[in-house]
Structure formats: structure tokens, C-alpha cells
Swiss-Prot record:
UniProt function note: Appears to function synergistically with RBM14 as a transcriptional coactivator. Component of SWI/SNF chromatin remodeling subcomplex GBAF that carries out key enzymatic activities, changing chromatin structure by altering DNA-histone contacts within a nucleosome in an ATP-dependent manner.
In-chain residues carrying the UniProt-annotated modification N-acetylserine: 2
Keywords associated with the record: Acetylation, Activator, Nucleus, Repeat, Transcription, Transcription regulation
Motif (SH3-binding): 392-401
Listed name of the protein: Protein SSXT
Organism: Mus musculus (Mouse)
Biased composition (Basic and acidic residues): 309-318
Spans annotated as 2 X 13 AA imperfect tandem repeats: 344-369
Segments of this protein annotated with the region Disordered: 77-120, 193-418
Motif (SH2-binding): 50-53, 374-377, 413-416
GO molecular function: transcription coactivator activity
Length: 418
């Protein structure tokens, strides 16, 4: 019991010195040993008492660590050894012995429950895993980090979704772009798109991002695009992020889009790569955004796009995209989109607002790239929503034209990518 009380006394002293901390750690070791002994003896009550004491010590240490980060320097060496035990023992009545060996981890995880984590924080280095994790954030922290950046992309996607965000996303975008890729996937996936998002939007995009991964390049591109996009930023980023991811994301993003997204996924994957280089053609506008040309068009469009609503601007943009940045694209798009789709497009665009105009486009060419026939069909579907009326409008036509564009898309995209 003396040991048991020693810790409390130590706490009472409130001495925050390496010696005091070491003493407490030693006490924790003794407590752990006692707990182990009692466990072996089957004395649960004593074990629980010591565990409580150990827990309090750990909490105390954690508090000290929080208040005095210098503790980290103090704790690391000795504490690592003892601490681990302490937390371990504390955290686990049964496993103390093993915990002792792994205790730190166990602490982090189990034991010390709060204290352990804190301690870990203190120890930080010692409990790297937990510490960082905790520090960073939950498991996701990694993701989070990426996510954050990634998220941004999402957000951009999200933005895409709502150009609104896109603006912010544009800001975040940069980061996002970078991360986007990497994290995008995880985040994206999980991210409930909206929320994964560390930035909400991004989340969704995120998961589109995963697709993005392919886009990773684009993200890179996007990033550089970002610069460009910054202005268009809204769109641009969005586009990049979204589009880049966009297509993919959009698809997911588009989830509404229904099938296409998935198909898109494939397409996106598939042309995502193309795009990815291209900056992801997907967004035609994006391409433009990405691509300086389109970029310019897009730029206007984006603004207009966002401003006007995805509808007309979109249409315009789409045309712009196609016409401008994506002249080639434009052609194809025009070809496939232009004639029938564009007509449909306006409506579609209107839908775009919801859909994110370019999503449609992305999809549009996404599909074009994605899978000429089937995907296009899907594409219409995906766009269908975007195309919404559009698809309905020209279920057949879009596809055929799309397919033509499809060739364009890819070829052009390839160029763009290049």
C-alpha cells in the first residue's frame, strides 16, 4: 500500500521536476508490478485500487505534460521505459505484464485512457504512434492532414458542386490539390463527400478524389493549375480538384449522377489518367482552366459560371470550354455536346447548377473518354442528371456525338495532358 500511496503523495507534492517525474514513473512501475502480482493472486479488488492509483498518476503526468511541455524532454528517456509500464499496467489490469512491455501503446490505446494519451502526448516521442495519431487526430489524422489538404480539394470539388465552395476550395484547393490526390482517396471515400471533407465539400470530392488519385497528377497539375485557377479558382480549383478529381469525384460527387460516376470512375480512371495529366480533361472547362487556354475560357466561364449559375454560364462555359480552352475539346464536345447536347445542355446546364455544370461536361467528355458508347450512355445518365433534360433530351445523340468527342477527348486530352 505504501507504494499505492506514494504516487498520490507524489502528486500532492506537485513537484514538476525530472526527479519527481521519475519517482512517479518508478512508483507507477511498482504499482504495475503490484497489480500484476495481485492479478496473479486473483485479488481483483487490490488490482483495481492500484489501477486507480496508477491511472491517477498517469493523469497527473499527462496534466503535467500538457501544462509543461518541457516534460517531454524530461520524460522521454526514463519515462519511456517506466511510462509505458505505468500506462500499460494502469490501463490493463489483466495484461499489465505484457502491457508493460507494450504498455505505451496499450496506454495510448487503452489505458491510462485519457491519461495515457496525454502522457503519450507528453511523451509524444515515446508514444509516437498514439501521440502523433492523437496529435494529428484520430486515425484519420494522416488522412486528416492529407484530407485537410485533400479535403480542400474536395471542397473544391464540393465547390464544384456548389461553385460556392469552389471559391473557398480554390483557396484550400492548393493544398487540396496536393493532398487531394494522396488523401483524396481515403478521405474522399470516406469522406462522406461532403464531410469527409475536412472541408465539407471536399469530403465528397474526396472520395471522388480517390479517383483523383489517378488525377494525382492533375492535382499536381491542378496545383499548378491552381495558380491559374486561383482566379478561376472557384471553378478552376474546383475544376481541378473537382474535375480532376472531378470527374471521378464528380462522379461520386455526382453520385447523383447515378451510374456515370461509377462509370466515370472507370472512365475517369481511364481518362482520369489522361486527364490527370491533362489536368484532367474532365473538366473541359477544367482543361481549359487547367490548360491555360481553356483555362482562360474557363476562367471567364468559371466566374460567369459560378456567377451566373452553372446554367448558362455553364452552357457558355461548356461551349467556352469546348470552344475556348478545349477548342479541340470544344469540337468534340461541341460535336457531341454542342449540337444536340448543347441544346440540351442549357437545360442540362441548369441542371448543372445542381450538378455542377462541368461535371456534366466532365462527364460529358469524361464519358467521351470514359467509354465512348456505354459510358456515354451512362455519361448521359450521369450527366443525365446534369444533362438531366439533356440526356433525356438527346439520349441518343449525346452518345453518338459524345463518342466522336470521345475520340477527341482522349486525343485532345492527351494533348492537353501533354
Amino acid at each position: 500500500m505504501s507504494v499505492a500511496f506514494a504516487a498520490p503523495r507524489q502528486r500532492g507534492k506537485g513537484e514538476i521536476t525530472p526527479a519527481a517525474i521519475q519517482k512517479m514513473l518508478d512508483e507507477n512501475n511498482h504499482l504495475i508490478q503490484c497489480i500484476m502480482d495481485y492479478q496473479n493472486k486473483g485479488k481483483a479488488s487490490e488490482c483495481s485500487q492500484y489501477q486507480q492509483i496508477l491511472h491517477t498518476n498517469l493523469v497527473y503526468l499527462a496534466t503535467i505534460a500538457d501544462s509543461n511541455q518541457n516534460m517531454q524532454s524530461l520524460l522521454p528517456a526514463p519515462p519511456t521505459q517506466t511510462m509505458p509500464m505505468g500506462p500499460g499496467g494502469m490501463s490493463q489490469s489483466g495484461p499489465p505484464p505484457p502491457p508493460r512491455s507494450h504498455n505505451m501503446p496499450s496506454d495510448g490505446m487503452v489505458g491510462g485512457g485519457p491519461p495515457a494519451p496525454h502522457m503519450q502526448n507528453q511523451m509524444n516521442g515515446q508514444m509516437p504512434g498514439p501521440n502523433h495519431m492523437p496529435m494529428q487526430g484520430p486515425g484519420p489524422s494522416q488522412l486528416s492532414m492529407t484530407n485537410s489538404s485533400m479535403n480542400m480539394p474536395s471542397s473544391s470539388h464540393g465547390s464544384m458542386g456548389g461553385y460556392n465552395h469552389s471559391v473557398p476550395s480554390s483557396q484550400s484547393m492548393p493544398v487540396q490539390n496536393q493532398m487531394t490526390m494522396s488523401q483524396g482517396q481515403p478521405m474522399g471515400n470516406y469522406g462522406p463527400r461532403p464531410n469527409m471533407n475536412m472541408q465539407p465539400n471536399q469530403g465528397p470530392m474526396m472520395h471522388q478524389q480517390p479517383p483523383s488519385q489517378q488525377y494525382n497528377m492533375p492535382p499536381g497539375g491542378a496545383q499548378h493549375y491552381q495558380g491559374q485557377q486561383a482566379p478561376m479558382g472557384l471553378m478552376g480549383q474546383v475544376n481541378q480538384g473537382s474535375h480532376m478529381m472531378g470527374q471521378r469525384q464528380m462522379p461520386p460527387y455526382r453520385p447523383p449522377q447515378q451510374g456515370p460516376p461509377q462509370q466515370y470512375s472507370g472512365q475517369e480512371d481511364y481518362y482520369g489518367d489522361q486527364y490527370s495529366h491533362g489536368g484532367q480533361g474532365p473538366p473541359e472547362g477544367m482543361n481549359q482552366q487547367y490548360y491555360p487556354d481553356g483555362h482562360n475560357d474557363y476562367g471567364y466561364q468559371q466566374p460567369s459560371y459560378p456567377e451566373q449559375g452553372y446554367d448558362r454560364p455553364y452552357e457558355d462555359s461548356s461551349q467556352h470550354y469546348y470552344e475556348g480552352g478545349n477548342s479541340q475539346y470544344g469540337q468534340q464536345q461541341d460535336a457531341y455536346q454542342g449540337p444536340p447536347p448543347q441544346q440540351g445542355y442549357p437545360p442540362q446546364q441548369q441542371q448543372y447548377p445542381g450538378q455542377q455544370g462541368y461535371p456534366g461536361q466532365q462527364q460529358s467528355y469524361g464519358p467521351s473518354q470514359g467509354g465512348p458508347g456505354p459510358q456515354y450512355p451512362n455519361y448521359p445518365q450521369g450527366q443525365g442528371q446534369q444533362y438531366g433534360g439533356y440526356r433525356p433530351t438527346q439520349p441518343g445523340p449525346p452518345q453518338p456525338p459524345q463518342q466522336r468527342p470521345y475520340g477527341y477527348d482522349q486525343g485532345q486530352y492527351g494533348n492537353y495532358q501533354q
